[in-house]
Amino acid sequence: MAEFSLDKSHIAGVVLAGGRSQRMGRDKAGVMLGAESLLRHALTRLSQQALHVAVNADAAAEDVPVVPDRFPGKAGPMAGIHAAMVYAADLPSITHVVTVSVDCPFFPADLVARLAAAIEHPSQIAIAASEGRSHPVFGLWPVTLAADLEAWIATDEKRRVRDFLLRHDVTEVAFPLHPTRASLLDPFFNINTPDDLVEAERWLEALRA
């Protein structure tokens, strides 16, 4: 049997930016980190790793396609992942879609390459991990799972990402901490509160040093 191989030419990317941002008190996609919004940080990183890039949000964002939830207000990040799958399935040559969260501006520059390298067959899912914790929102998903995910969202009341993963073959990819001038940074550090934003500014400066 030929070894399965997946590269950038078959991968689309979607930034999940449809959350309510209650602890931040405002839409996180538009929050400024340095001179750019969190959404722009995510798009810049993702566009270097995927053939097509879009944003899962409720309204127009930046200069990329917007992919709204088909289950608004009901399924949390799973609705965004489903929307990403549906969007990617309509693109020529695309077999997989990678999802990232808008509130994690430092996610790895080799996220997609390492997730893709870990996949052993077309229907397998790859998710990221660091520091012993999985980050299922950062996942590489076969677009063929869209119908199954849609049915699962419609019937499962909890709709947690981890519960859906239990239905499928999943591989987890551990990413190392990133060295900076200050200390080691978890690349999946996320910004949920104003205090987190202050910390992110410090990390941004440390990375630039």
Curated annotation (Swiss-Prot):
The keyword GTP-binding applies. GTP binds at L16, A17, G18, K28, N56, D69, D103. Its main location: cytoplasm. InterPro entries: MobA-like_NTP_Trfase (IPR025877), Molybde_CF_guanTrfase (IPR013482), Nucleotide-diphossugar_trans (IPR029044). Mg(2+) binds at D103. Its EC number is 2.7.7.77. Its cofactor is Mg(2+). SUPFAM superfamilies: Nucleotide-diphospho-sugar transferases (SSF53448). CDD domains: MobA (cd02503). Coiled coil: none annotated. NCBIfam families: molyb_mobA. Belongs to the MobA family. This is Molybdenum cofactor guanylyltransferase.
